[in-house]
Amino acid sequence: VPFELFYSRFPEIAKAETRSISVLENSRINRLPAADYGFMEAFCDEPGCDCRRVFFSVISSQTKQIEAVIAYGWKTKNFYRNWFKYGTDEDIASLQGPELNLSSPQSKHAEGILRLFEEILQNDKSYIERVKRHYKMFRATVDKPRNPLLRRRRTGG
């Protein structure tokens, strides 16, 4: 499933509403180095998909690198079981809630960043509602009906 940054379609909103967490020098939060950790949202850009998931690429202000990629599904396990009909129990469990994305490279700080998400952001109801709103906005641009008059003509034989 392809994912695209929310920023790519809504740059001004993303600039204003992307969440970051500051870890101070002596705080030792989850053994993370002092930095601001920005949680950049990415959503599925496959037409017709309704996975209700977000991937956070977490970028450190110190390294300017992606330190973790967290997948988060906010719906129930029953929702994901119906959505992914042929998935195993393990597949379904991985779709719901936060986890490090297994197919993305992760830094040595990824586990600590995941705990930071679980302890702070996942429990912030207004933030999770904002992510859901961003998902709906993004999906509306992916799933909007196409004008048949704008279709390209096929050429060749």
What are these regions (language model features)?
Residues 1-24:
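Charged, compositionally biased non-catalytic regions
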Residues 116-157:
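C-terminal charged interaction modules
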Residues 2, 38-40, 102:
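Mixed-charge, polar/low-complexity N-terminal
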Residues 12, 99, 146-149:
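Generic low-complexity segments that are intrinsically disordered, proline-rich and/or Lys/Arg-biased
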Residues 62-133:
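An exposed acidic His-Trp-rich patch
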Residues 4-7, 38, 80, 85:
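Compositionally biased, low-structure terminal segments
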Residues 52-55, 81-87, 145:
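Surface-exposed beta-strand edges and their flanking turn/coil or helix-capping segments
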Residues 23-72:
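Amphipathic, interaction-prone secondary-structure segments
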